[in-house]
Amino acid sequence: MSMPDAMPLPGVGEELKQAKEIEDAEKYSFMATVTKAPKKQIQFADDMQEFTKFPTKTGRRSLSRSISQSSTDSYSSAASYTDSSDDEVSPREKQQTNSKGSSNFCVKNIKQAEFGRREIEIAEQDMSALISLRKRAQGEKPLAGAKIVGCTHITAQTAVLIETLCALGAQCRWSACNIYSTQNEVAAALAEAGVAVFAWKGESEDDFWWCIDRCVNMDGWQANMILDDGGDLTHWVYKKYPNVFKKIRGIVEESVTGVHRLYQLSKAGKLCVPAMNVNDSVTKQKFDNLYCCRESILDGLKRTTDVMFGGKQVVVCGYGEVGKGCCAALKALGAIVYITEIDPICALQACMDGFRVVKLNEVIRQVDVVITCTGNKNVVTREHLDRMKNSCIVCNMGHSNTEIDVTSLRTPELTWERVRSQVDHVIWPDGKRVVLLAEGRLLNLSCSTVPTFVLSITATTQALALIELYNAPEGRYKQDVYLLPKKMDEYVASLHLPSFDAHLTELTDDQAKYLGLNKNGPFKPNYYRY
């Protein structure tokens, strides 16, 4: 049974008809305007950046920026912080000054500073522990006289760390440890605030080393502390400016890759200053490496590939804290997860967590996603890549770009096709495609973001490590690699507990005596495995 047409109220029918005519006229007028607007063509780069050799001056153009903008850069573009010429001119060829007249920096666009400042302020809201440390120690200025040269990811979270170091009395010069992880607007905000920062998203390898060199090689300014992430800064100083180490009081290193390089130097007797291994501190291993990766692996994969995880077969290479975080997230969304491991202890942990431990060769033909988390080199070789199924996704959650043999894919018979920012299709002669993310570099910071609160824990640990090394009396630390004192780990954790309204139980005198502990800690021996 059909319903009768609705009857308009008396006197309203003609008004509705006129309103409809006006609405139609406006709609067609708008459509005509849209039709006349010229269509913008997406520009794809003809040549891929070759990272096996230093490019020429004309080869310094940002690869990622010439193709597509990151999620954060799109906001700044919409707010008219950038113009089309920014993608054509290398920051090294620009003459920029901040509002104070200083040009002691090199960033993508200093006009992005206002937007970057808002990003930093947002990050500060979830980094209350670092802000608390800044307020507690600001009067004492424990880093007064410190000249810190840093090479880390330059994000809103690390900007909070850098500005905390400055508030505690340090002078800082900074570069990026990854060519894709810099937030341009944040770098601009730091430059506007007076920090000598040399970094932008999409640097070439030549740019990367140039930025590090500008931080170290400065007339009238010599660093006495190093904060490194990956060991590239430390390597550059050893290679180019070994005399700088005469004034360096210590190195703080936060990544497994950089720590490995420090231990190699120590073993060879070439480590000439004390170094603090932040990566293996409890507050880095058990929080940043685990929880940060558990959340950011999914974010990075979703943003780049729109992949559905349920039912997908995924192999994760390495079951350390990073691997554990990745596997937990993938398993929770229904992925079928395999593990590769060299360590029988980690392998047994994987088995008891419900994962199959396999050799990569055994599953490489069937898996949909390959993730590396080892800190090693050539974990995924050209042979593995040749045997992968069509549309297999390959990415890295370790620090450096050595885990996947990307260099072996730069051959004439393979075609590279950039399909979106940080996503390349590598096409074999038979038409097979492998989806390579961030050119084998760190997925989460290259393609997405990471949880601010977790980074607050790591940043606070780094700040305390710098304070400890800088103020340590002569002789406390020798030319070796050290772990952060347990008491400092506990202090970092205690600063973050108020965010959860958590309240610690206090030992009685009798209980403390029974356990042989100080009531105020440390509560665990150095050999304790959390």
From Swiss-Prot:
Subcellular location(s) of the protein: Endoplasmic reticulum; Cytoplasm, Cytosol; Apical cell membrane; Microsome
Main location as per UniProt: endoplasmic reticulum
Outcome (variant: residue 70 to A): Highly decreases interaction with ITPR1. No effect on phosphorylation. No effect on interaction with SLC4A4. Abolishes interaction with FIP1L1
Modified residues (N6-acetyllysine): 40
Region (Interaction with BCL2L10): 138-201
Oligomer status and interactors: Forms multimers. Forms heteromultimers with AHCYL2 (via the C-terminal region). Interacts (when phosphorylated) with ITPR1 (when not phosphorylated); the interaction suppresses inositol 1,4,5-trisphosphate binding to ITPR1. Interacts with BCL2L10; this strengthens the interaction of AHCYL1 with ITPR1. Interacts with CFTR and SLC26A6; the interactions take place once AHCYL1 is released from ITPR1 and increase CFTR and SLC26A6 activities. Interacts with RRM1; in a phosphorylation- and (dATP)-dependent manner.
Role noted for this protein: Multifaceted cellular regulator which coordinates several essential cellular functions including regulation of epithelial HCO3(-) and fluid secretion, mRNA processing and DNA replication. Regulates ITPR1 sensitivity to inositol 1,4,5-trisphosphate, competing for the common binding site and acting as endogenous 'pseudoligand' whose inhibitory activity can be modulated by its phosphorylation status. Promotes the formation of contact points between the endoplasmic reticulum (ER) and mitochondria, facilitating transfer of Ca(2+) from the ER to mitochondria.
Protein name (record): S-adenosylhomocysteine hydrolase-like protein 1
Species name: Homo sapiens (Human)
The gene coding this protein: AHCYL1
